[in-house]
C-alpha cells in the first residue's frame, strides 16, 4: 500500500500514515472508495470533498428507522396532529405560492430514506428530537437527573412554537440538527455558523500555516470565517528547495485539498523545506455529478489555481516578512478556491488596523487591479481597453471574497475611512475594546470578554481565536403578545445552550467553547416591530427579555453542570430563514416597501426551477454563470412598512444602537445603507456620533441598477400586477414526492450581502 502524507513537521520529507487528530474530521476514519495501488505516488488523505456523499455511504442504512441514533423521540400521536396543518409561510409570490415554502423546500427539507422530501412538520420533529437527544445523552453520560415525561412536555411546547414560527434555529440548525452528521457523530461543527482565527501566533510555534489551512477547512464546511492581520511582519519567508520529488497525489476530499494548501504554504514559512509538487489526477473531472446535491464538480482547476496563485505570491521572497496584504491575499485566495470548487459559498472578514494604508487599499482597483480582477496597465492602474472599459483578467480576482474592516477603539478618529467607505463600502469598523469590556451597553463594564480578538463575517459575534458562533433566533412579531414572546425565549435560548454541549472535531475550538459557552439568541423582524409598536415598547421587550434569558441560563447551566454562558444575545442579519417565517431580517428595514421583484438562484436542471417555470415565473440563465445557473424572478409581497430608502441613515444606526444597549451583550450586525447623493457626506458624523454606542458598523450605498438580476428590484404597480396575475400554483406535491434535489442547507448567519455566491 502507498504511504500517506499527513504532516511534514521535521525536515520536509517525513512521511506518516495517519492524519493528525487535530486536523481529522469527524468522518476521517471512513475508508476511501478508491483503491490506490501505485507505490510511486504519495497520497494526501482526507474526508471526501463532497461530505454528504461520503457520510451517506458510511452511515449504517440496514435499519428501517433512519433516526436510530437519536436518544429522544417524540410520540407519533403528538406529531401527527401537525401533519395536515399548513405552516404560516412568509412572503407570498402569487397563486398561493410563497418564498417561505420555496426556501424551505430548496434549503432545509432533507431527503428521506424513501426518496421523498421532508414536510415542514417532519423537519420540526427532526430538529426537536435532535435537540432533546443531545440534552438526554449529556444528562445520562454525566449521571445527571433526566425526567422523560418532563422532557416530552418541554419538547412538545418547543415543537409547537417552532412550527408556528415564533423561534427557530439558524438555517444550519434547520438543515443539520437531528441528522447522523450531528447526533450520530456527536459533532456540532455542522451546526456552527461562523468563526474567527487570529494570525497573531503564527511565529510562536512549528505550525505557522495553521490559520490559513483551518480557514480553508472551515470554509469548505460552510463556516464563515473572520481573520486578522496581527501576524504581519512577524513571520519571515523562505524559498523552498527544489529536490525533484515525486508528485504528491491530492485526494478528492476536503482534507486532501486542505492538506495540500497547508503543505504548500508551510514550505514558504519554515526553513529548509522541500518544494511540493502535486498530482491532481484523482480529483473528479469538471462536470461530474455531485451525489445528493445534484450539482456538478468544478474539477481540479480551482485547487490548481490556488496553488499557482500562492506560489506566485510567495516565490523568491526569501528574507522578507509576511505582510498584512499577504495575509489577506492568502485568505482571499482560499475563499475564491472554495467558491470556484462549487463546494460552498464563501464568507470572510479580514480585520486590519486603521493606519495600514496597504490594508485600506486592498480593494482599491486603481492601486490593486489584479486583486479585483483587472489587468494591470503600464501606469500601475487597471489597463483600459479599446472600449474605454477596464480589461478583466482571465482568471478573475480574489479580493472580493472578504469584507474588510478595521480594529478600532472608542475615541479614535476614523474620519479618514469615509473615502473608502463611499468608494466601495469598506472598511467596516469593529470596536474591539468595547467588545472586550462590555456586554449590553446598558450594563456596567465587566471586562469578562477580555480574550476577544475578532468577530465573525457579519459582525454580530465577538470571538476569541478559534471560537465559533452558536446562534438561534426569535421572531417577536410572530408572537401573540409579550408573555407569549417571553415564554418563547426559553426554548430559543435552550436550543443554543444545547448546541454548546456537543464538541466540534477541533480541539483548539473546544478548549474555548467549553469555557465560554457563548451563544447568540437573536431577535429578527425588529424594523417591523418598531413600525407597529414603537421604539419604547421594543426597549421593554428587549430589556425584560434579556433578563429572562439570563434567568434561564442560570437554571439550565446548574442542571447541566456547565458554566453559565459568557454572553447570550445578539442581533444577526438573518437570511433565508427570515423568508421562511415571514419577517424582515434582523434590525434592517426591508429593501422595498410592500411589493417588488425578488430573484432566486438555482442550478440548471433543478426540477424546482422547472416547476417554477411551468407555474409561470420568469426563468432565465444566470448572467454570472449562464452554463450552469438559472435566475427565477418572483413578484413578492412583503410587509407594508417603510423600505430602506425611506429611512434615514441616522435612524438605521439608531435602531442598532438601541439593540446594543438593551438586548445584545455580544454585538449587532448592521449594514447601514445610505443615499450616495444626500448622505455620503454624513458618514464621518455618524461614526463619531455612534462611537461607543455600537460595537460594529458597516455601510453600503443604496443604488438602483447596481447589477443585473439583483435580488430585490423595484417595479411599477402595473408591471408587478401583470407578473402576479400570470402565475399559477406550483406543483409542490411532485417536488415533495421526490423530484426536488436534496436541500442545500445554509452557510453562515448571513443575508444575501454577506456571502459570495457560487
Where are these regions (language model features)?
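Extended catalytic cores of very large enzyme megasubunits
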Residues: 2-758
Amino acid at each position: 500500500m502507498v504511504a500517506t502524507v499527513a504532516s511534514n513537521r521535521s525536515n520536509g520529507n517525513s512521511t506518516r500514515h495517519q492524519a493528525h487528530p487535530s486536523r481529522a474530521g469527524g468522518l476521517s476514519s471512513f475508508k476511501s472508495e478508491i483503491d490506490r495501488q501505485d507505490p510511486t505516488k504519495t497520497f494526501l488523505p482526507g474526508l471526501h470533498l463532497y461530505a454528504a456523499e461520503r457520510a451517506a455511504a458510511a452511515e449504517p442504512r440496514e435499519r428501517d428507522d433512519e433516526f436510530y441514533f437519536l436518544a429522544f423521540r417524540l410520540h407519533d400521536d403528538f406529531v401527527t396532529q401537525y401533519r395536515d396543518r399548513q405552516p404560516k409561510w412568509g412572503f407570498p409570490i402569487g397563486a398561493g405560492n410563497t418564498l417561505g415554502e420555496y426556501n424551505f423546500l430548496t434549503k432545509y427539507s432533507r431527503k428521506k430514506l424513501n426518496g421523498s422530501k421532508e414536510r415542514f412538520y417532519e423537519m420540526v420533529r427532526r430538529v426537536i428530537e435532535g435537540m432533546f437527544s443531545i440534552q438526554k445523552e449529556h444528562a445520562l453520560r454525566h449521571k445527571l437527573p433526566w425526567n422523560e415525561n418532563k422532557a416530552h412536555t418541554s419538547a412538545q411546547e418547543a415543537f409547537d412554537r417552532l412550527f408556528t414560527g415564533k423561534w427557530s434555529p439558524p438555517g444550519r440548525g434547520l438543515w443539520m440538527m437531528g441528522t447522523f452528521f450531528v447526533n450520530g457523530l456527536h459533532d456540532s461543527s455542522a451546526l456552527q455558523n461562523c468563526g474567527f482565527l487570529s494570525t497573531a501566533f503564527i511565529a510562536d510555534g512549528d505550525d505557522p500555516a495553521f490559520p490559513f489551512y483551518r480557514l480553508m477547512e472551515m470554509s469548505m464546511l460552510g463556516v464563515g470565517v473572520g481573520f486578522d492581520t496581527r501576524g504581519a511582519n512577524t513571520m519571515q519567508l523562505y524559498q523552498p528547495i527544489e529536490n525533484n520529488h515525486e508528485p504528491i497525489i491530492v485526494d478528492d476530499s476536503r482534507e486532501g485539498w486542505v492538506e495540500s494548501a497547508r503543505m504548500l504554504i508551510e514550505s514558504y514559512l519554515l526553513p529548509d523545506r522541500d518544494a511540493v509538487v502535486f498530482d491532481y489526477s484523482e480529483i473528479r473531472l469538471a462536470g461530474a455529478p455531485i451525489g445528493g446535491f445534484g450539482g456538478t464538480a468544478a474539477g481540479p482547476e480551482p485547487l490548481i489555481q490556488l496553488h499557482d496563485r500562492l506560489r506566485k505570491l510567495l516565490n523568491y521572497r526569501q528574507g522578507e516578512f509576511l505582510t498584512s496584504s499577504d495575509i489577506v491575499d492568502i485568505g482571499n485566495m482560499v475563499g475564491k478556491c472554495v467558491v470556484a470548487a462549487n463546494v460552498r459559498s464563501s464568507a470572510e472578514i479580514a480585520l486590519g488596523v486603521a493606519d495600514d494604508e496597504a490594508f485600506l487599499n486592498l480593494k482599491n482597483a486603481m492601486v490593486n487591479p489584479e486583486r479585483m480582477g483587472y489587468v494591470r496597465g503600464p501606469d500601475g492602474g487597471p489597463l483600459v481597453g479599446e472600449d474605454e472599459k477596464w480589461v478583466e483578467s482571465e482568471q478573475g480576482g480574489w479580493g472580493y471574497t472578504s469584507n474588510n474592516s478595521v480594529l478600532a477603539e472608542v475615541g479614535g478618529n476614523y474620519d479618514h475611512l469615509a473615502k473608502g467607505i463611499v468608494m466601495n463600502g469598506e472598511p467596516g469598523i469593529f470596536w474591539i475594546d468595547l467588545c472586550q469590556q462590555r456586554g449590553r451597553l446598558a450594563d456596567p463594564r465587566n471586562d469578562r470578554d477580555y480574550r476577544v480578538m475578532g468577530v465573525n463575517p457579519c459582525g454580530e459575534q465577538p470571538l476569541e481565536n478559534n471560537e465559533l458562533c452558536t446562534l438561534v433566533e426569535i421572531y417577536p412579531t410572530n408572537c401573540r403578545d409579550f408573555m407569549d414572546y417571553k415564554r418563547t425565549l426559553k426554548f430559543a435560548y435552550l436550543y443554543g445552550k444545547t448546541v454548546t454541549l456537543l464538541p466540534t472535531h477541533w480541539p483548539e475550538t473546544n478548549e474555548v467553547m467549553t469555557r465560554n459557552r457563548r451563544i447568540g439568541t437573536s431577535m429578527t423582524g425588529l424594523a417591523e416591530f418598531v413600525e407597529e409598536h414603537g421604539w419604547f415598547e421594543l426597549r421593554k421587550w428587549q430589556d425584560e427579555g434579556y433578563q429572562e434569558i439570563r434567568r434561564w441560563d442560570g437554571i439550565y447551566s446548574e442542571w447541566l453542570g456547565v458554566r453559565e454562558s459568557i454572553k447570550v444575545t445578539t442581533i444577526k442579519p438573518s437570511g433565508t430563514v427570515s423568508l421562511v417565517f415571514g419577517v424582515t431580517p434582523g434590525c434592517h428595514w426591508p429593501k422595498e416597501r410592500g411589493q417588488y421583484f425578488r430573484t432566486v438562484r438555482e442550478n440548471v436542471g433543478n426540477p424546482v426551477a422547472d416547476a417554477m417555470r411551468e407555474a409561470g415565473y420568469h426563468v432565465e440563465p444566470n448572467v454570472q454563470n449562464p452554463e450552469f445557473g438559472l435566475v427565477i424572478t418572483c413578484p413578492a409581497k412583503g410587509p407594508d412598512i417603510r423600505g430602506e430608502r425611506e429611512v434615514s441613515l441616522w435612524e438605521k444606526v439608531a435602531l442598532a444602537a438601541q439593540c446594543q444597549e438593551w438586548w445584545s451583550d455580544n454585538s449587532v450586525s448592521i449594514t447601514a445603507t445610505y443615499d450616495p447623493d444626500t448622505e455620503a457626506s454624513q458618514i464621518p458624523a455618524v461614526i463619531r456620533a455612534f462611537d461607543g454606542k455600537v460595537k460594529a458598523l458597516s455601510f453600503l450605498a443604496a443604488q438602483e441598477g447596481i447589477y443585473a438580476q439583483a435580488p430585490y428590484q423595484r417595479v411599477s404597480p402595473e408591471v408587478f400586477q401583470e407578473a402576479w396575475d400570470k402565475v399559477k400554483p406550483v406543483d409542490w406535491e411532485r417536488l415533495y414526492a421526490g423530484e426536488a434535489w436534496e436541500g442545500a442547507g445554509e452557510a453562515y448567519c448571513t443575508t444575501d450581502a454577506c456571502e459570495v455566491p457560487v
